Structure formats: C-alpha cells, structure tokens
Amino acid sequence: MTVSAPAATRAAVAGMARERTGPRERALAFADFHIHTRFSRDSILSEEKFIRVALDRGLTHVAVTNHNNVEGAMAVRDKAAELGVDDRLTVILGEEVSTSDGEVVGIFLQRTIPRGLTAAETADEIRAQGGLVSVPHPFDPFRPSHIRREPLERLAEAGKIDLIEVFNSRVTFHRHNQEAAEFAARYEIPGIAASDSHSSFEIAMSFNAMPAFENVDELEAALAQNEWHGSRSTVLIHLTTRYAVWSNIVRGWLGKGTATEPILGPEAPAEVKAEPIEAPTPEELPDPGDPEASSDRG
C-alpha cells in the first residue's frame, strides 16, 4: 500500500517514533532507504549531524547510500554506536553504484561494489553479498545518471530488482515518480519512497512505515505492509549539492579536507553530544568524475 502525504505527516510520525526507546519496542519501522553523507562529493552532511536529525525526525532505520562506497555508511554505523544510539537507529550499509547503464542502489551490503559494471553485473554483486537491489529515480529526465529504460526492463524481466523508488523527493515533476510507480506495478516490484537527502534539511522528507525489521528476510516480509509517505523537496535544494561539490573541490585545492555542515540544529537525545569530526581527505572520496558528483542534480 502506498500513501503520498504532505511534510506535516512526518512530524506526526516522528512523534510516534520518539515514544519508542529500543528495537524490541518498535511496533513500526520508519525507514529511509536512500541517504547521502559527506562521503559523497555532493554532500557535506556529517555523521553526527545526520544522526541528530534522523532521530529528531523519528526515523528508526536508515540506508546510507553514498556514491560508489560503503565506507560512509560504515562511518554512520560506527558513530551511532559511539554515541550509544545504535539501539534506536538501525544503520543499513548501502551504496549508490554508478553502473555503465545508470545508477543502481544496493542495501545490506558488506563491501564496496566497483563502479563501471553493467546494471545486471552490479545486481549480481549485490545479491552475492546477500543484499537487496533497489532502483533510484528511474525516470527522472533531469538526472542523466538514472538507469536507462532498456537495461531497467531487462533487470525487471530477470527478476533482479527487489525495490524501486516510486517516490523520490528530489524528482521535480510528479509524473516521473508516477511513471516509476506504474513500472513497479507492472512488474510487481515493491515500491518505496526515498528522500535522496544530501543535506540535513531533506532527511525524512520521504519515508516508509512498515513492521519493524532487522535483516533482509524481515524487510522483504515487511514490504508487503509498507505505507510510504512522500514530500517533494524544493527544486532549489539542488543548489546545496552544487555548493557541496564546489566546497569540496576548493577545500581539496587548499589541502583542507572536505567540508561538513555545522553540528547544530534539532536537539539530540541527552546522550548525543557534539564532538569534533575528522573529515576524509579528498583522496578518500569517490572519483570526482562520478557523473552524479559532478552534477547539481544529486
């Protein structure tokens, strides 16, 4: 079941989520399966800022899907454990992979999948790690990095797609999300909503409410009862990715590492305290030739 709802809905859901204190007490999971942090060149969102905002807005499960690396997701997972909130925020290791056919997302990964493989090869690599294959923003014409129609159909016909984004907050026009929903229905692929957030403002713009899950099998079962809630980001949000790209380029030239958002904003739980964050060096980030990283359409 899918539900499109205004941003006000997430405030109500956040209030419901905050009533729970541990994973066993969660009757529902509130999940976002497509989020970027500073380990994507087009984001400056730090691990701690991300965790603060995600908890404040009521998310319980997040798939961190940086461009062409899982190290960013590992950094969020480790920071959540360090802050003592990993029992309240389940961090799923993910990656948005730049394939030769367009972007494919893998979640529940163990290690980075190399860029440049075909979409089918990438799907096989994701499955080999015990992960799930998700297709992000498949029909957004403003993002040349999206997967092309022919390889998308081949993946679907081969049964190699586990999830498809039927609502992506960064898709400008509703008809392109609707096209994704129709494609998912045609091939009977579970649909999800995703914020595709690259900044703290966007976190939980879209999310999925479903029975709580802790692993791939439980998620696949929970998807049958998923109710997704979607709100579109303003088109101006793409300026934040452009700012992030150029900030990181300039800081790289100056030898100052990567930029990060200030650790300010919504009040975090008492046990979450602001601490200095060591930013990765430019060499540790994905290749700036990444078409997604070099575009202002993140």
Where are the regions a protein language model picked out?
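Divalent metal-dependent hydrolysis catalytic cores, especially in the metallo-beta-lactamase
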Residues: F50-E71, G131-S134
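Acidic/Gly/His-enriched mid-domain segments of enzyme catalytic cores or analogous surface patches
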Residues: P136-D140
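Charged catalytic cores and adjacent phosphate/nucleic-acid-binding surfaces used
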Residues: T2-V53, E71-A80, D86-D87, I92-L93, ...
